[in-house]
Amino acid sequence: MKATGIVVEYNPFHNGHKLHLNKARELTQADVVIAVMSGSFVQRGEPAIIPKWERAKMALAAGVDMVIELPVSFATQHATIFAEEAVRILDAIHVDTLFFGSEHGVAEDFTFAAKKVVENEARFDEAIQLALVDKKTSYARAYTEAFKKLFGQNLLDITKPNNILGFHYALAAQNQNPSISLQTIPREHAGYHDEEANHDQIASATAIRKLILAGKLEEASHYLPASSIAILRNYEGPFLSWKDYWSFLQYRLIQAGSEELEGIRGVSEGIQNRMQQAATKAQNFSDFIELTKTKRYSNTRLQRTALQILLNARSQTSSPYIRILGMNKTGQQYLSLHKKNISLPIVTTVSKAPVGLLEEELRATNIYTLAKGLENYQAGDFHIPPILTL
């Protein structure tokens, strides 16, 4: 069976995702499409708008054959780690092709750039450090400066969010298994961060979440496949954002000592002190970010750091594993064919997982389900089984 892997968040699953999924199957001639998906919290450092099990249902209903959870310790980090660990999972489950959307749309350029970075690793790292020192800028900007210095302006614009992820997928594949084929298609109509829906059928997940959180589900439904609309209408819980967790974060920052926070993943350069001061003044999460941000810390980096503090995520990361959230008959057939040759631990029943393997994930789910209205999902890692569809 020919397998194609995709890395997703489906926050929520919309028409752009449906187009991407259909193209992944068609262009790679895949027998099975396997999605590695963020769980309760996503890469921008935010809570997912609905629980991971509902988003897995959306994926399966739209045609994904298997949904694997990207562990929270990787799903909520910067592009390098996010991509490395997603590719590690897809490689372990033996995908032939990694398929992704990008603003650039030419897979060969991603592969070429990744090979060049691997070949010039010392020079590239030196260029990053020079940019950090000379320009007193964020790591992301320093990385972009080093990339431009190495390749010039024209090869690949890694200031674009999907290009940077695509580049890190290519880099991870080069480092882990260069035989994984890469394919990409250009994103259509909506930019990743577009906050307004400006096309008849395609809008960014950001714009769709904005509509849903404003109580405009019917308006948002123009940009969702029928299967996603049905799941959202049947969903009985709240639609979530940082406002549902702000009081928990505020308490954590006020209650904790500065030294205690130093050991949290992503906390550096004394940023915890600014955050603790802001927590006593801010009225909401948006105020908090505005009061905390600096030239070196983008809003997204601050959100990620705030999330790690909320989750009490220590600097060490967890070991990778394959946690299956759901699969259809094709996915089950593929798993049975390859199960004996998969190098990572496979988790279908959490209670049978090796002790400590899912510790951070379980804590993240417990914190996520503190939001009012999620009582049915509390301890869901234990009582909600993988979703199996025909």
Curated annotation (Swiss-Prot):
ATP binds at residues 7-20, 101, 162, 187. The keyword RNA-binding applies. Its main location: cytoplasm. Keywords: ATP-binding, Cytoplasm, Ligase, Nucleotide-binding, RNA-binding, tRNA processing, tRNA-binding. It comes from the Bacteria. Its EC number is 6.3.4.-. Disulfide bonds: none annotated. It is an enzyme of class 6 (ligase). GO terms for cellular component: cytoplasm. It catalyses: cytidine(34) in elongator tRNA(Met) + acetate + ATP = N(4)-acetylcytidine(34) in elongator tRNA(Met) + AMP + diphosphate. It is found in: Cytoplasm. GO terms for biological process: tRNA modification. One of its GO terms (molecular function) is ligase activity, forming carbon-nitrogen bonds. It holds the Pfam family HIGH_NTase1. Catalyzes the formation of N(4)-acetylcytidine (ac(4)C) at the wobble position of elongator tRNA(Met), using acetate and ATP as substrates. First activates an acetate ion to form acetyladenylate (Ac-AMP) and then transfers the acetyl group to tRNA to form ac(4)C34. Belongs to the TmcAL family. This is tRNA(Met) cytidine acetate ligase. It comes from Listeria monocytogenes serotype 4a (strain HCC23).
